[in-house]
């Protein structure tokens, strides 16, 4: 009886949380998408990757979370409706995997920006980034369709992809940190001879690196609970795991509301554009 009450309370709490977070994800990501479109100082490859991530986060708030709330209500009423669950499964895999892949692609882009340096603009073109982003969405759609088929091995494949991406992204940032430290040691000597434009470009790159690192950290915190509970449930289901599993979904969806806040916090050009947008909407508060 206690376990049943605990599960019921968990479902209700997650209904409330996801109803609220759905609204924040929609509002914040719509503003972010508009701000990204109106920020000319961002390079096209970086803007494309950020837009893709914002669109996937908007999809989480607009489609995934409302459907998840419907699934939770269905569980509370103890009704089994396959149509709702199937819709949730497709949307969840589509947008969450696209968001997950978007963070990885963003990290890879910043790694290439600092690793290739002068060759970055030559090799990482807008067309190539668009091709990568398109491939991510196609792959996400395929995985979503496979999830609908209830293929057992899909959970193992998804867990493997998560592990590889976690490790690779961590290695990327270790390398980025090493390069930044190396550049910092040379900064005093370069400051005398480097042109102002070069110094400004270096500072801008460093700021975007810091911003994407925070995106990665928040992503890690939000996604790890879902990954851990998913792996644990492969070895058997328990009442505690059922409770934790519902909260782990909410943690993943929380990420879609936090990403826009990180952009505004750590990227001054986007923050300024957001301010301009808000001032145009609410002129009295300007």
Where in this protein do the model-derived segments appear?
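Extracellular N-terminal segment of 7TM GPCRs
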Residues: 1-31, 284
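Extracellular TM2-ECL1-early TM3 structural module of rhodopsin-like
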Residues: 7-19, 46-105, 113, 159
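Structural signal for membrane-spanning alpha-helices in multi-pass inner-membrane proteins
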Residues: 32, 68-71, 75, 140, ...
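Intracellular effector-coupling site of seven-transmembrane GPCRs
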Residues: 56, 178-226
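Class A GPCR helix-loop hinge within the 7TM core
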Residues: 96-134
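Extracellular-loop-to-transmembrane junctions of the mid-late helices
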Residues: 139-178
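Seventh transmembrane helix
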Residues: 169, 218-231, 244-286
């Amino acid at each position: 009886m206690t376990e049943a009450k605990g599960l019921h309370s968990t479902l209700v709490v997650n209904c409330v949380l996801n109803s609220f977070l759905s609204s924040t994800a929609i509002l914040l990501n719509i503003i972010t998408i508009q701000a990204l479109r109106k920020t000319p100082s961002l390079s096209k490859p970086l803007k494309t990757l950020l837009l893709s991530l914002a669109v996937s986060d908007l999809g989480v708030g607009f489609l995934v979370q409302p459907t998840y709330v419907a699934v939770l209500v269905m569980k509370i009423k103890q009704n089994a409706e396959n149509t709702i669950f199937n819709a949730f499964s497709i949307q969840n895999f589509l947008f969450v995997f696209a968001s997950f892949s978007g963070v990885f692609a963003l990290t890879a882009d910043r790694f290439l920006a600092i690793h290739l340096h002068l060759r970055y603009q030559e090799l990482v073109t807008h067309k190539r980034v668009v091709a990568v982003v398109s491939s991510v969405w196609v792959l996400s759609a395929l995985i979503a369709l496979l999830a609908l088929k209830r293929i057992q091995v899909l959970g193992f494949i998804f867990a493997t992809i998560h592990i590889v991406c976690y490790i690779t992204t961590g290695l990327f940032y270790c390398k980025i940190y090493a390069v930044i430290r190396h550049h910092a040691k040379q900064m005093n000597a370069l400051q005398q001879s480097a042109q102002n434009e070069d110094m400004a470009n270096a500072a801008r790159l460093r700021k975007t690196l810091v911003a994407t690192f925070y995106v990665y950290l928040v992503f890690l915190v939000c996604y790890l609970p879902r990954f851990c509970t998913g792996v644990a449930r492969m070895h058997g289901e328990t009442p505690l795991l059922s409770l934790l599993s519902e909260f782990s979904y909410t943690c993943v969806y929380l990420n879609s509301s936090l990403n826009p806040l990180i952009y505004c916090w750590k990227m001054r050009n986007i923050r300024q554009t957001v301010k301009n947008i808000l001032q145009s909407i609410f002129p009295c508060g300007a």
